[in-house]
A protein has these predicted regions:
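Small-residue-rich midsections of specific transmembrane alpha-helices
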Residues: 22, 28-32, 49-77, 96, ...
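Interfacial/gating helices of multi-pass transporter permease domains
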Residues: 33-56, 181, 186
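Helix-terminus/linker motif at the lipid-water interface of multi-pass membrane proteins
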Residues: 30-44, 115-116, 172, 177
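Residue-level recognition of pore/gate-forming positions within transmembrane alpha-helices
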Residues: 22, 26, 53-56, 91, ...
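N-terminal membrane topogenesis motif
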Residues: 1-28, 83-85, 90
Length: 200
């Protein structure tokens, strides 16, 4: 009864779900890098690591959007203003689309210089990185909304499914198509689309 009483507490249940989900996702990320490092070798994995670093660097501002959306949606939820939540998400999504529409061509134009700087053998690695950043931006919007709505089960499910497909698809493409960091990126992009679909 004591345990069931604790589980009925929204804060305890939400914290437990988030902790368990984050642990599984981090574990999946660990195995992702461990397996890919073994499969790709130092040169290809080094290129992938450099592109992942570029992704994280460009995506730093996304954290601010995460906090803003979560705070706004949670305030609407506490006031039972679901229509406001939908309007707000639609408004932010429109802004994200406009920013992406303007930024993507600019980022693509910078591909050549970044490719030379990182000593990559293909411009597609940079282009796939920009696609991943835009997807990350959109996914963060809807996952932040799930946090604000206290729908931690949906949030964690989306994250776990995305990580699972990221590992499976990336490894599968590398093994059956070719040992290239580009195949790992393609697997990541497809997994992100699946994660976005679950979050919606």
């Amino acid at each position: 009864k004591y345990i069931s009483g604790l589980w009925s507490n929204q804060l305890v249940r939400g914290t437990t779900i988030l902790f368990a989900g984050s642990t599984l996702v981090n574990l999946g990320g660990f195995f992702y890098h461990l397996i890919l490092a073994r499969l790709l070798g130092p040169v290809e994995y080094g290129s992938l690591a450099a592109l992942l670093g570029l992704t994280y660097l460009v995506s730093i501002p996304i954290g601010s959007m995460d906090l803003l959306v979560t705070k706004m949606v949670s305030s609407f939820e506490s006031s039972h203003l679901l229509s406001h939540t939908r309007s707000f998400l639609f408004y932010v999504f429109n802004i994200v689309c406009k920013i992406s529409f303007v930024a993507f061509p600019i980022l693509v134009l910078s591909t050549g210089k970044i490719q030379d700087f990182l000593h990559l053998n293909s411009p597609w690695g940079i282009i796939f990185t920009w696609i991943s950043v835009i997807l990350w931006l959109v996914i963060t919007l809807f996952r932040s909304a799930l946090k604000g709505l206290v729908k931690f089960e949906g949030l964690v499910t989306s994250q776990i499914i995305e990580m699972a497909f990221r590992v499976i698809l990336s490894v599968g493409l590398i093994v059956f198509v070719g040992k290239s960091y580009l195949n790992a990126q393609i697997g990541t992009i497809i997994a992100s689309l699946i994660g976005l679909g679950v979050a919606l």
